[in-house]
């Protein structure tokens, strides 16, 4: 099953067949629109003139990699920090998986092991790691035993709560609507807590 995110065909093709590009896109998916994050690996390929290997990125001069990330339009709003994270990611792939990014999931014997491996990558917090496991299962058919349990709640069938569920503009809209509702709920709770604190202070 190919990746079908709301990015151009070239970017989706790269994400679908190049595991390192998919990991980089997921890593960059923070504090910027997901369209920008998942287009960035294809932009990186264009700037380098070829698809980089993990070994190449691991060995890249850090300053030169930052310069490439910083070219306008920058690959991320924090190009220096993210270039460094991508390089750390590449080094882990080289050191722990013999340079084969796909081995992160193809050699995992269970969903729990897969989640542990993804969680050890830079930029993959608890939620993002579960989302990535869900994305692998839902969109690429990577389904070791227990993958759904390892990636709850993002693995639920028929859900529209993360990038793992985005396959077209309609699903993108549903996921964005869900996230907007979460933000509104969180904001309402914060206002309520503030009002309660004011009332408590007034009553003391």
PLM ranges: what are they?
Residues 48-119:
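Alpha-helical ds-nucleic-acid-binding substructure associated with the helix-hairpin-helix region
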Residues 10-21, 32-35, 76-81:
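Structural motif
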Residues 30-39, 93-99, 141-143:
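Short helix-capping/linker segments at secondary-structure and domain boundaries
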Residues 23-27:
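Short, aromatic/basic-rich helix-turn unit that serves as a nucleic-acid recognition element
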Residues 20, 34-50, 54:
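A positional/architectural concept
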Residues 1-12, 17, 111-115, 126-204:
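C-terminal accessory module of base-excision DNA glycosylases/AP lyases that mediates lesion recognition
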């Amino acid at each position: 099953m190919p990746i079908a995110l709301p990015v151009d065909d070239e970017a989706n093709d790269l994400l679908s067949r190049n595991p390192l590009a998919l990991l980089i896109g997921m890593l960059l998916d923070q504090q910027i629109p997901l369209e920008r994050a998942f287009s960035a690996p294809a932009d990186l390929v264009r700037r380098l003139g070829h698809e980089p290997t993990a070994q190449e990125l691991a060995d890249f001069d850090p300053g030169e990699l930052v310069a490439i990330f910083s070219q306008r339009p920058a690959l991320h709003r924090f190009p220096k920090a993210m270039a460094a994270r991508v390089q750390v990611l590449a080094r882990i792939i080289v050191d722990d998986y013999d340079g084969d990014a796909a081995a992160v999931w193809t050699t995992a014997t269970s969903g729990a092991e897969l989640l542990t491996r993804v969680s050890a990558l830079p930029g993959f917090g608890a939620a993002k790691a579960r989302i990535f496991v869900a994305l692998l299962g839902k969109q690429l058919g990577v389904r070791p035993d227990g993958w759904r349990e390892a990636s709850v709640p993002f693995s639920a069938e028929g859900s529209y709560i993360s990038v793992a569920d985005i396959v077209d503009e309609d699903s993108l809209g549903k996921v964005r609507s869900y996230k907007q509702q979460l933000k509104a709920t969180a904001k309402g709770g914060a206002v309520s807590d503030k009002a309660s604190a004011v009332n408590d202070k007034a009553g003391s």
